[in-house]
Amino acid sequence: MKDKLIKAALSLAVVCGLGACTKNYLDINKNPYEVDKDQMEAKDYAIASGLSAMFGTVVSTDVNTAQFTDCLLGGTQGGYYADANNGWTNTISKYNPTDNWTNVFMYSDKVIPQLYSNMSNVEGISEDPLVMAILKIVKVCVLNRVTDTYGPIPYSEIGSTGKIQVAYDDQPEVYSQMFDELDEAIALLDENIDRSITSTTDQVFDGTAVKWCRFANSMKLRLAMRVVYTDFVSSKGLSPQQLGEQAVAHSVGVMQSNADNAQLSSLAFGKDGNPLYTACMYNSPAGSVTGGDSHAAADIICYMNGYEDPRREKYFSKAQFSGDNALEYVGMRRGIAIPALSTVGLLYSGVNFVDGMATPLQWMNAAEVAFLKAEAVGVFGWNMGGSAKTFYEQGVRLSFEQWGVAGVDEYLVGTTLPESYTDPNGGATSYSTQLSQLGVAWNDGASKEEMQERIIIQKWIANFHLGNEAWADFRRTGFPHLIPAMESAVGNNSQGIRNLTLGARRMSYPADEATNNPENYAKAVEMLGGSDNMATRMWWDCNPAVK
């Protein structure tokens, strides 16, 4: 190769010495292996486009997809949103959904196919280790939500097109692979920690390697806590405790401040804006100031009203009832016969988005990480580098800061309790049972169960809009206590659910899997260890106290 380059240089010298070089010298003599400015810009655009499409699969930027996955599923089962469209007779909240309500995570072309096809495209044009790390992290973020919805899922056998009619992986194996991919991403980021990619390529962290590394470690801590009640051992022989401690002890560590929050910029949205905002506003009656298809759930408002939580004005619009409930925060009960939206439903508090259509899509926040550390220390005795009280109060402070509200010092010493639910529309849907006996103020002498409940309640409030994460915590810990669906609304078509307090533990697989992928579907149900319905618990849902 060296001889060829020397000969090429000599030939060029001879040609130029014999006469003037051609005026098109720069074009004719361009190195065919060198990328010019136009090609580089095209490559950068292709990478940015692929990453943006992948980012849009974590919390989907497609409004219809996001409505099913994060409003009608996560939003309701997490106790944040209530279904308000009285045209819906079959809902997840009533445990009688149709297949097109529950198959979205696996069958929508806006989730797995969009993730894998764009991941394959980016891998084909970039060898940048930062980009490769981002691909791995985003893949874990997406498929974590999928496996936590169904249990065993296709993972290792999915190809570049995202086709899911392949063999399923058992859920422990899915988690093992997710931890491995996070570790691979962290290793790549470690080697390039002072580098960045073009900020316009990255609509989450502006191309900053350090922030992606903190996010990866934070995800690792989140997943370690998810499997805490299992006997899980990673491919490297690590227990959940060791995985969590490893994430926190890493040189870059986990999220520490709101500057570390993982959220997708509104620059990534299409004309419809924030998909959750648009989905909540669908079918708003004329003149409504509270929204349409989704309204605020009674569950979270009962807690926040009782705690006199100043974040309410950021989370909800005020109810439009008259009399004693005028201009107060009043949520709608989930799992009921939905009242007419145009006359009654529009009177309940709506779901608020601080910047409307331009509100960023939250993936994970520093407050959640602080609460993860508080639970790890207080309940399970992990070494997180501080006390449970310190991390608990840090989580509350971070959330108040994130939402831009004052009064955190007074809030942290509060002893008031969540209020019971009185429905202004009539007593039949009211709920008089006390949801919790705990105030906000920390108690060092509390039992581990009480510590866990207090931590999860505040984590739940801080994670508003992240309904799928709230639902996962509810299944894992039993907290917060939520208002159950009404027996009269659920009827007999309850997807195997007999205990309304426990609620839905998973979603059924897409109905077509039984015919389009029968052998692999049968094996998936066998790995699940129970019937393919909403009552069967998945592998990590094994806390003996939740029964």
Please give the residue ranges for each predicted region.
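Bacterial Sec-dependent N-terminal signal peptides
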Residues: 1-30
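Intrinsically disordered or highly flexible coil/loop and linker segments, enriched in small
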Residues: 14, 18, 63-64, 321, ...
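Membrane-proximal, proline-rich intrinsically disordered regions
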Residues: 21-79, 125, 492-547
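Short, compositionally biased low-complexity segments
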Residues: 22-32, 84-92, 148-157, 412-432
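Extracellular glycan-recognition regions
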Residues: 24-26, 102, 480
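Beta-strand acidic-aromatic groove motif in beta-rich domains, primarily in extracellular
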Residues: 62-71, 152-153, 467-472
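Structured, solvent-exposed acidic/aromatic patches
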Residues: 81-407, 444-453, 458
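C-terminal functional modules
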Residues: 400-547
